[in-house]
Amino acid sequence: MADPVSTFAAIHDAVAVPLAWVVILSFTAGSLLEFHDREHARKLLVGAWGVFAVFWAVQAPHFAFTQRSIVEGLGSLVAVPASLYVGYLLWHGCDSLFVMSRAVAAMGIVFIPFQVVQPLEEWLVETVALQTAAGIRLLGMDPTLIPWPEAAQRTGEVLGMGQAQTANYAEQYANYRNTFYFEHEGHPITYTILIACTGIGSMAIFAGVIAAVRAPLRRKARAFAVSIPVIYALNIVRNVFIAVSFGNQYAQVAPDLVMTLFGTNDVRMVSYYVADRIVAQSLSVVVLVVITYLVVRELPEVMVVVEDLLYIVTGNEYDIQSALDVDAPDPSNAAVRADGAGEK
């Protein structure tokens, strides 16, 4: 019988990228059409949100079982009904969701090229890997940063893997200089920087929201300055923390519990799951909330997106302007919110 995880991985690999293109093209087309024919754009964007729900349905098992990421798995699962609900609200006249739709289009335009254009992916991944290595050196360590195939070859030699098995292992990742190689008590440990480790996903989210709202470029630039560079820098810190913790096995906390929780039999992976999946991802949520606050302070227009998101997730209305004590955005940019506020 086929391994369920392998089945999920095969389905994801086959449909994720084509679905992503359909999602981005649909949102982009709908956002452009909005300038000329809002009602026809509404229909197209409602369909785009439906496809977006399918996209997240495919991502959920990938994150939960293949990547073994609790935070991303749950987030993807929640995104399925949330996307359908956004489409429902947009269909019934919640015009502020045009802003959120434009944001999704802009996010995709930023993110997808790094995901599918190999030279761009290689440049970003290797740049982040080099800067992570520099960060590790600041801690007084001398990391070994090598191409993945070389790391796979070294691993195969140490573990006594056969030539065919080693060659197959070397094909797991692209031939980028993006892998930190450690040996702990004679056992090889590798930490490979992938596109998901570059922070491009989070940066694309903020870039998309900033681009989607209608506001002066000067304030958009300030919002960009307090979000994108901060995310990039903190992501380097995150990679340094994970590489050092995993490579040196510094995070061997409650190994039996962690191995059970993440479904692994390799005790050395405990440090990785604790450092990345538990500590780093939990702190990332806190950091993104703080950055959202900074962006809202500089660009109050994004409050409509934040308030709509909170309404969609909780079903309750929130007054972000009062809660964060920020100036109200230009009334001329106001739209009908998801909860109906702003409707004339």
Segments and roles (model prediction):
Residues M1-K344:
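Hydrophobic N-terminal alpha-helices or hydrophobic patches in metabolic proteins across all domains
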